[in-house]
């Protein structure tokens, strides 16, 4: 491409999910509702865990961190998407775009690490139940959460720095509802070889490493569960992992489909749809998945609601 067509852009134009005017109001209403459910549901999980002393154990400490990550993850993209739906310009500044990319990557990877830590918690609880409190001490839990945050920020810094090295053409329209890595790479005038290489190597190690750790944890859990003599006992033990497995399947399935494939085969339209699933739908469903399948959370929630009812209607 002729170098005269290259430019240092000051802003990008986010085209959003749809360019059809008649779809804008329904999209705004649907995503506003999902965002409200996500924020309220995850805040309820955090508040419940903080207010119930019996839930101050590693499993629920990690769950509250997952809920906080989900709030931040969705808040990185949805408010801006709702704004541009009715904006005549649909503009995001260059700096704002890089910041959005940074925090999106950071919270996506943080969720990845927290899901791996939660799998380790289930492994210790089922495979070493008598040593659970000795192994998963409060200090170890804090260290693991801090490590999740630190590694997530380092990962985000690397990929955001590489995006910042790209040069963009005069056409600065991003066919997406946020500054997604692949969408930005698609409109770059310069080679994205290093970006793609890092996604498929360092990125793959981060994501696949966590997924392999989760798989190994559940392989050990299954071996222990199979030794339980009664079918009822096996089901009761393994059912404690059902919520986590559901979230893992949705999160890694959609994430792998979007990012771990050649850039040439990346479909913007399909990418937008799949991205909505793991950036909006999954964080919205997580509180319901964990609360509906968890007796402690359901019991704590009912007690919390009872206290609220007594407080407001006494």
From Swiss-Prot:
One of its GO terms (biological process) is sensory perception of smell. Keywords: Cell membrane, Disulfide bond, G-protein coupled receptor, Glycoprotein, Membrane, Olfaction, Receptor, Sensory transduction, Transducer, Transmembrane, Transmembrane helix. Glycans are attached at residue 5. One of its GO terms (molecular function) is olfactory receptor activity. It is a multi-pass membrane protein. The chain crosses the membrane at residues 26-49, 58-79, 101-120, 140-158, 196-219, 237-259, 273-292. Residues 1-25, 80-100, 159-195, 260-272 are extracellular. Signal peptide: none annotated. It is found in: Cell membrane. Disulfide bonds join 97-189. Its main location: membrane. One of its GO terms (cellular component) is plasma membrane. Residues 50-57, 121-139, 220-236, 293-314 are cytoplasmic. It holds the Pfam family 7tm_4. SUPFAM superfamilies: Family A G protein-coupled receptor-like (SSF81321). Odorant receptor. Belongs to the G-protein coupled receptor 1 family. PANTHER family: OLFACTORY RECEPTOR (PTHR48001). This is Olfactory receptor 1Q1. It comes from Homo sapiens (Human). The lineage of its organism: Eukaryota, Metazoa, Chordata, Craniata, Vertebrata. The gene is OR1Q1.
């Amino acid at each position: 491409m002729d170098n005269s067509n290259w430019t240092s852009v000051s802003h990008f134009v986010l085209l959003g999910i749809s360019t059809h005017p008649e779809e804008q109001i329904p999209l705004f209403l649907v995503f506003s509702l999902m965002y409200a459910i996500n924020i309220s549901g995850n805040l309820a999980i955090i508040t419940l865990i903080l207010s119930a002393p019996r839930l101050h154990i590693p499993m629920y400490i990690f769950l509250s961190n997952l809920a906080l990550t989900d709030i931040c993850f969705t808040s990185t993209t949805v408010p801006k998407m709702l704004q541009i739906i009715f904006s005549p310009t649909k503009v995001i500044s260059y700096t704002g775009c890089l910041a959005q990319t940074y925090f999106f990557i950071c919270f996506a990877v943080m969720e990845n690490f927290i899901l791996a830590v939660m799998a380790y918690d289930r492994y210790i609880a089922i495979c070493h139940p008598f040593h659970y409190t000795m192994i998963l001490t409060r200090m170890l839990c804090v260290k693991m959460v801090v490590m999740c945050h630190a590694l997530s920020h380092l990962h985000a810094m690397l990929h955001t720095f590489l995006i910042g090295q790209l040069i963009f053409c005069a056409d600065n329209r991003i066919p997406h509802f946020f500054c997604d890595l692949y969408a930005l790479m698609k409109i770059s005038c310069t080679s994205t070889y290093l970006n793609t290489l890092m996604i498929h190597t360092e990125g793959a190690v981060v994501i696949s490493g966590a997924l392999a750790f989760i798989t190994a944890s559940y392989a050990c859990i299954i071996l222990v569960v199979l030794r339980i003599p009664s079918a009822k006992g096996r089901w009761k033990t393994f059912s404690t992992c059902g919520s986590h497995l559901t979230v893992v399947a949705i999160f890694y399935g959609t994430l792998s489909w979007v990012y771990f494939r050649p850039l040439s085969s990346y479909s913007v339209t399909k990418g937008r749809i799949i991205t909505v699933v793991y950036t909006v739908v999954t964080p919205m469903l997580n509180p319901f998945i964990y609360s509906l399948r968890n007796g402690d959370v359901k019991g704590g929630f009912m007690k919390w609601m009872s206290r609220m009812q007594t407080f407001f209607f006494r």
